[in-house]
């Protein structure tokens, strides 16, 4: 019996491998904890500081008494409007551009140059996009400081990532699917519409939805192109979800958080932390929605 046990006992090389494996596991676990625990600590701290003002009235009331009381209805509605409008502009243009670059454009120096420009534009700081929006949309296009100028600026800022995510999602679809469809007599567009896009939709939607959270959290582009310190809107109601005209300035959560934290005297810290909690909750909700979409759509794949 002891001979059998000795025969299958791990040797020094095997013991060393197991030791390295356990050490790697512990290191990865500690690294993950070092990333997650500070985030949870920050989130808990912000929620505790915001707790005195977190209520339904905080969401559905306008700021009052020179921004020292009330809620965040006007900034919340402004953020909703500008994000929806920017997404309505950027999503179709970005997806169509990604489809063209992936499925129609020939592989040459011009295509490589365009792809390189798209990748580089994704890393341009938001303040540069803000200055571009001022020059093009506020001044040249004549929109003025308005929700239209801010939405167009955010759309330009989010376009590169949407294009990139679309091209990568389309490239992930096996080329054999296209060949099989072509052999059955389908045209290029029929192949894209019925085979390629349905199999790439999870990656495309993930890229689009994640840009919603980015647009909702940006401050510089809207600060330069349309966000104001205070704009009164009608309190809660279905009609008040779109109180702004395209040429009207607006309030936004990110800029509202900045102003009450740095420019308003007499405002309690709870108001600023409450605004931060709502903004964080909005971003987390969008990210969770993108994860759910991706998981559910990928589960339908047959490959």
Role assignments for model-derived ranges:
Residues 101, 167, 171, 175, ...:
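C-terminal transmembrane helix and the adjacent membrane-cytosol boundary/short C-terminal tail
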Residues 73, 77-82, 118-122, 171, ...:
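Alpha-helical transmembrane segments of multi-pass membrane proteins
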Residues 39-51, 133-139:
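A structural signal for multi-pass alpha-helical bundles of membrane permease subunits
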Residues 63-70, 222-280:
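Interhelical loop and adjacent transmembrane-helix boundary motif
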């Amino acid at each position: 019996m002891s001979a059998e046990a000795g025969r299958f006992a791990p040797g020094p090389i095997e013991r060393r491998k197991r030791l390295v494996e356990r050490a790697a596991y512990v290191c990865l676990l500690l690294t993950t904890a070092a990333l997650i625990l500070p985030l949870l600590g920050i989130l808990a701290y912000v929620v505790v500081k915001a707790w005195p003002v977190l209520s339904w009235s905080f969401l559905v009331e306008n700021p009052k008494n020179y921004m020292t009381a009330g809620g965040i209805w006007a900034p919340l509605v402004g953020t909703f409007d500008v994000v929806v409008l920017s997404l309505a502009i950027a999503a179709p243009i970005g997806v169509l551009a990604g489809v063209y670059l992936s499925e129609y454009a020939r592989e040459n120096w011009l295509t490589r140059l365009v792809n390189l420009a798209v990748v580089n534009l994704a890393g341009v700081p938001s303040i540069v996009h803000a200055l571009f929006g001022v020059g093009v949309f506020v001044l040249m296009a004549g929109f003025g400081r308005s929700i239209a100028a801010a939405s167009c600026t955010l759309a330009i800022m989010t376009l590169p990532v949407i294009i990139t995510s679309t091209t990568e999602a389309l490239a992930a679809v096996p080329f054999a699917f296209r060949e099989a469809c072509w052999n059955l007599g389908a045209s290029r567009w029929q192949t894209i519409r019925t085979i390629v896009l349905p199999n790439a939709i999870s990656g495309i939607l993930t890229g689009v939805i994640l840009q919603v959270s980015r647009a909702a959290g940006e401050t510089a582009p809207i600060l330069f192109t349309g966000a104001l310190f205070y704009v009164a809107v009608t309190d809660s109601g279905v009609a008040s979800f779109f109180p702004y005209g395209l040429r009207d300035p607006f309030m936004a959560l990110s800029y509202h958080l900045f102003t009450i934290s740095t420019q308003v005297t007499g405002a309690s810290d709870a108001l600023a932390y409450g605004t931060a909690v709502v903004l964080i909750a909005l971003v987390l909700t969008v990210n969770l929605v993108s994860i759910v979409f991706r998981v559910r759509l990928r589960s339908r794949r047959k490959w």
